Amino acid sequence: PEHLNTPLWDQLEAQINLGMQGKNKGLPMGFKKLSNYISNIQPGRYDLIGGATGTGKTALVDSAYMYNPIKYITQEKETDFSIKILYYSIEITPLQKIAKMVCRKLFEDYSILVDSESLFSRGNRSLLDKDIAKKVFATRDYFEKMLSDHVIFYSAASPDYVWMTVKDYVEKNGTIVRNSNKMIQEYIPHKPNEIV
């Protein structure tokens, strides 16, 4: 029989060869058991997380798809991957999200447990301790670099807005190949190892 000689078969062989070179490990998400089932964060794969209200979906997604991968990339010298996160938040503002990220960093680096409302000394909470405030302010460079290199926050999130901003990002950061019916046939990113 004649061998299959198609672009699809070529892609199959290329993926097998990359895997044999250890280049299909993906980007670690910080949850080993989960990664055993879904093989880490992989380029070109869409993961959907669903569940009831208040069950920790946002906390899981933030940890697995933002905090842990960014931490891995910034600390690991041998990774081929980079990551860019287009973060659409309907529930909380970018300021609130950054405050939560700062609280997490305080806990990771100093074992200081503080929530974002306490960080802002809101309501009947005590004023934030000056030593903790100094530690918060010392994280500025870390977070500014993280945001400039890895995260773009969007506070509006209608379906049309999401489509428009993703389309703009894709067009600026890659080449879209269309067929004669103008359907997208292939996307060739300028940075093939960047997971978006």
Where on the chain are the PLM-derived regions?
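The Walker A/P-loop phosphate-binding site
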Residues: E2-Y110
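Cytosolic-facing regulatory segments adjacent to core modules
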Residues: N36, Y72-K191
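Short acidic catalytic loops
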Residues: P192-V196
